[in-house]
Amino acid sequence: MQIRTIGKPSIDNVLSQIVERYEAQFPGRIRACYLTGSYAEGNAVEWSDIDVYVLFKDAFVSEGEAAQAEQLGRALAPLTPLRLDLHAGSEQSQDSLPGFLRAAVKNTSVLLYGEDTRKHMSLPGLEEYTRDATEIALKFLLWLHQVENVTYPLAYPDPDGAFFGYDQLQVLSDSSDRAEARPGIRFLVESACRIGTALLAFKTDRYVSTKRESVQTYRELINDEWASFLEAMFERGKLCWSYNLPENEEERAELRILCERMLPFENHYLRAHRAYLLAQLGSNNEAAKQFALQGLKQVIYLDEAGDKLY
């Protein structure tokens, strides 16, 4: 069984076991196995997930096979202390995958095993991709503020905190011992980059699949006052500090400045988000209208008198 390695023994061991377990349980059914995300791009840090997509040949032979494929993915989580984000799909059902995942597999993945089918894969339509990018950006924003909905304009999560509440307890995976959690900035960096991706979707026709690609493309195509902020958030927050709080006082001051700027960036995004949702609400597409209505439930926009408006 020929499995491509990425040069990180602990991760390569996990990836090999994933492929072997899928081949053992579904002999002859696996078309390919792809690695996406930070490990595929080569800039993974301590807190990075392992992102894998297992592609079955043709269609799933039954609903049972599809369920077993997903169940196996969950069962493999204990192979690593890191968060294992594993999706299984079939060639016939690829168009039903989330748009961001389809774009990631086609454009920025690494083939670990099997036949390379990426040239035959289609990208999601721009409208679908934009809805997905918007939904993910809002999800991370809500996680960052630890709420189910927000009111525009936002306030800092903790105005009196050293980092305005943007530093939060983080663990390696959902199964990690909560006693091992320590404060970090993973959600902060993730949220900033996801917002950048959504703004790109609003303003351009470019698909991006990774944080680095999002930041670089934002600089290339939008290049506004937030381009340097996003670059610093990615390069310092992820690549330099590995989502951890820096210990050096000078670097902590640098992080505090980034955190201070995060709030106006979030509000900048929410203004663009509202304009996008209103456009969707006025379209003839029923799915777009429903998406907009749901989004307007999660973000409450008030007028100067404090009354709710769309």
Predicted features by range, described:
Residues A232-Q280, N284:
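Long, charge-rich low-complexity segments
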Residues G37, E41-Q71, P81-A88:
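Catalytic metal-binding acidic patch
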Residues M1-Y34:
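Helical scaffold of the NTase/Pol beta-like nucleotidyltransferase catalytic core
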Residues Q2-S10, V14, A66, E70-F187, ...:
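Conserved NTP/Mg2+-binding pocket subregion across the NTase superfamily
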Residues K203-S242:
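Short, charged amphipathic alpha-helical segments flanked by flexible coils
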Residues E180-L200:
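P-loop NTPase catalytic cores that bind/hydrolyze ATP
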Residues L169-S175, T197-R212:
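Extended amphipathic alpha-helical interaction segments
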